[in-house]
Amino acid sequence: CLGVLQHTPNTLDSIKELNRVLKRGGFLIIDHYKHHIGHYLSLYLVYWYLIKNLPKSIQAKVTNFLTRAFFPIHWHFRKNKIIQYILRRISPISFYYGIFELSKEQHFEWSMLDTHDKNTDYYKRHYTTKKFNSLLKQNFNFASCKVYERGNGLECIAIK
């Protein structure tokens, strides 16, 4: 169940329901946004608050417009670490150059998708690795459970 939990009203309740329908010996693979100090040192939450409060009928148009406007700037300065550092603090888009080996077109598509995803979600929860591990250990008795920091946050592979 990837890319879903952070978009539900309650992460713990959602994992409990997944666990309820999981057979013994079955794999539970989930992910969740990770808490990152950068969320508070950028305009990320400001953009999110403004965009999520727009009518749903125009949210995609707004995030697509922002991606089309900011992506060329990010791409032009993609190899300049200082400007990228600044852009990542003021730009509303997701940009993954240097993280994933993708073509320019693929980078644009990922930016378009993730810019919409991060700016229009109704619920905004992030976990630290420690708190996510604690949530899982205190509430579940998995035969095996491991949390990894990768992707866009935290990934968990557990066996019931």
Task: Identify the function of each model-found stretch.
Residues 1, 23, 29-31:
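A structural signal for short, well-ordered beta-strand segments and their strand-loop junctions
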Residues 1-9:
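A short SAM/SAH-binding and catalytic strip from SAM-dependent methyltransferases
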Residues 8, 36-41, 154-156:
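Short catalytic/ligand-binding loop motif for oxyanion handling, primarily in non-cytosolic enzymes
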Residues 12-24:
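A short glycine-rich, Lys/Arg-flanked "PGG" loop and its adjoining helix->strand segment in the class I
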Residues 27-74:
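Conserved class I S-adenosyl-L-methionine
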Residues 91-98:
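Long, low-complexity, polar/charged, intrinsically disordered or flexibly structured peripheral segments
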Residues 100-160:
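C-terminal lobe and adjacent flexible extensions of AdoMet/dcAdoMet transferase-like proteins
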